[in-house]
Structure formats: C-alpha cells, structure tokens
Amino acid sequence: MPTRDDLIKRRIAESEKAGKSTGVIVRGLQAVAYGLVTDWLTGNIDTEGGRIKYTAKNLGRVQGLFSVFQKFQKEYENTVLGSVLDWAGRLFGLNEQYFDTFDSPAESVADAARRLTLQRWGYNTLTGELIPGGYFQYLFSNANIGQRVAGLVNQAIAQKMPLAQFQKTFRQVFVGAPGQGMLERHWRTNSFDLYQRIDRTANLVYADRLGLEYAIYSGTLEDDSRPFCIERVNKVYGRDEIAHWADLQFAGKPKIGYDPFVDCGGFNCRHHLSWVSNEIAAHLRPDINKQKAEK
C-alpha cells in the first residue's frame, strides 16, 4: 500500500514523464510537417536547372502552403490533445489515489476534478471540444509557424535558391536538433509546466471540495531552481499564506494572471501543491495549532 509521500512522488514523476512523452510526439509530428512542406514544394514550385524560379507565379503559389498547414493542424491538434488527455487522465487517477488516503471519501470529487481541471485549461469534457479562446486552443495553434515557413519559401524564391539546398536548409531550421525545431520550440515555450499545472489544479479541486486548508510545496530542487522555490520546497503553507504570494515580486512570476494556487513559482516551475488534512499539517508544522489558539 503506497504511502501519501509515495503518491506525492508518483504525481511529480508522472508529470515529468508526461512532458517528455508529449515532447517526443511533437517532434514526430514536426517531421511529418517537414515532409508535407517539401512534397508540396516539389509538386508546386517551378524550377530551372535545379534552382527555384523567381516568378510571380511561384510567389503566388506560396499561399497554397497555408492549406497544407491547415490540414496538418487538425492532425497535430488531435494527436497532441490525445496525448495530453491521456496523461491528464493518469494524473487524475493518481490524485484520486492520493485523496483516497484521507478519511473523507473522494469518489464523488473525482469527476468534478477532471471536468473542472480540463475546463480551466480550455477543454469541454461534455462536448469533447476545445473551448474557443482557451489555453489549449492557443497551445495547439501553429498558424504563426505556417507564416514563418511561407516567409522562408518566399526568400528562397527571391534568391533563386537551388531546391535541394533549400530543402537541406529548411530541414536544419524547421526540424533541427532534438528540441530545437520550430514546432518543438513553440510547444516547449508554451507548455513547459503544463502537466504540473494540471496536477495542481486537480489537487486544488479536491482540496476545495474536502475543505482542506494546508498544502505542502512538494518537489525537489534543481541547479536552476529559483529563490522563491528554494525557500518554500517541502514546507507547509495555509491558504492565506499561499494567496499572499500574489502580492510578492519574484523572478519567474507572470506579470498578468498569476494564480499562486496553480502557478506556484511562476514560469517553468516544476513544483506541486499537495493538500493535506489539518492534522497532518499540524504534525509537519507544529506552530499551526499555536496560531489557531491565538486567533
């Protein structure tokens, strides 16, 4: 029977594993997109002597690239969303196990945790669709990538670049080394702590429904951990103390929309809030009972 600490560690490890797994999927889809673009170039752009011709006809055809990206976008969205929902489901399961160790039954909270967590990040569990204007819709959108690719093709046409040279150069720019491709950079920049935030949100829904007042700032420290996290890791905090973080200024804090209960240490924070009962909180932090007595 895993202990509460074991389940905290599992949630943290699963969040890390989820991020790496989805990153691999994004890189694979990036290779698919590269193939689609190069196939389109071969079939649609006129060349002469192996060089791309600088003609109004070629420049006008570049618009067709957007249709290629629109079709790819649907495949990308469905595949990556499937991965996110799968890993989110595992995190929901671990959160349910975690709260099953409490005296209060968590069964009735499980569905609400899934629904409210995914809703917060832009997915409607009732319709199975992305919420317009939500975080997921922005995360899965690669319209700016399509514009950049079209710009590169326009430059190649203007320079009458050899098609083979462009394909090689484009591969270096679009795919690049692992983690450095266009789609990968967009994904990593905007989703670095996605699964950590999903876990924090689910844990908070349970805490709200079960009336829990204290949380452990869970996780480990890395070489690049910021002072905010170094000061708080593995310590217990009450809701009022956590809410007060919104009034602080610290490295990594988003300038707009910071929610201390979900964002913790801000951009790229890998720590979690693990909510505990008052009894456990008082055991881990004896001054809590003293504070209550003084109120």
For the regions a language model picked out, list residue spans one by one.
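Acidic, glycine-rich two-metal-ion catalytic cores of nucleic acid-processing enzymes
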Residues: 180-286, 290
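N-terminal leader/targeting and assembly helices and adjacent pre-domain segments
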Residues: 1-179, 276-295
